[in-house]
Amino acid sequence: MENRWQVMIVWQVDRMRIRAWKSLVKHHMYISGKARGWFYRHHYESPHPRISSEVHIPLGDAKLVITTYWGLHTGERDWHLGQGVSIEWRKKRYSTQVDPDLADQLIHLYYFDCFSESAIRKAILGYRVSPRCEYQAGHNKVGSLQYLALTALITPKKTKPPLPSVKKLTEDRWNKPQKTKGHRGSRTMNGH
């Protein structure tokens, strides 16, 4: 019988970032209690030899599964040492892969306190509102002018340690374009 291949999107991530993300997840599961209901599966509990860990995040009757891998083929850079992350949304027998932005938005719908658009109406009507969002990674759009004005009144409280963001876990910090700060150069080289 022929081998059957299944292709998955795996985000290449360096091992220190995966390690930091795992410790943030464990902290908020076991110490702060903000990730109540999440399930962490260790590498020795998985039958697959390349799976380093799995985090199962319940989202109503569905769940988000963030799987970290080790021992993968290395990328084109030296620091891509065979570590990776896949993000999957599962409901009963159906599963699909999602990108880090959508994963953060899904997490934000079910977990962590937020100062949402509905708070604008409550504030105008004179009700007390809590203008803080604990999970900023779940917002990927600019809010309305009223929303921005109300959030400008009270600065968001920084949580220590930060909440685990899937987007932050998978972001490519190695291949970002370099920014030059105030580089003047010689007058002959830049045309002056």
Swiss-Prot record:
Region of interest (Disordered), ranges: 159-192
Topology in the lipid bilayer: Peripheral membrane protein
Compartments where located: Host cytoplasm; Host cell membrane; Virion
BC-box-like motif, short sequence motif: residues: 144-153
UniProt signal peptide: none
Region Interaction with host APOBEC3G, annotated ranges: 40-44
Expression induction: Expressed late during infection in a Rev-dependent manner.
PTM-bearing positions, type Phosphothreonine: T96, T155, T188
Ranges for region Multimerization: 151-164
Site note Cleavage in virion (by viral protease), residues: L150, T151
Biased composition (Basic residues): 176-186
Residue positions where Phosphoserine is found in the record: S144, S165
GO molecular function term, any single one: RNA binding
Main location: host cell
Keyword annotations: AIDS, Host cell membrane, Host cytoplasm, Host membrane, Host-virus interaction, Membrane, Metal-binding, Phosphoprotein, RNA-binding, Ubl conjugation, Ubl conjugation pathway, Virion, Zinc
InterPro entries: Vif
Residues covered by region (RNA-binding): 75-114
Protein residues bound to Zn(2+): H108, C114, C133, H139
Post-translational modification: Processed in virion by the viral protease.
A GO term from the CC aspect: membrane
Domain notes: The BC-like-box motif mediates the interaction with elongin BC complex.
Protein name, as recorded: Virion infectivity factor
Organism this protein belongs to: Human immunodeficiency virus type 1 group M subtype B (isolate YU-2) (HIV-1)
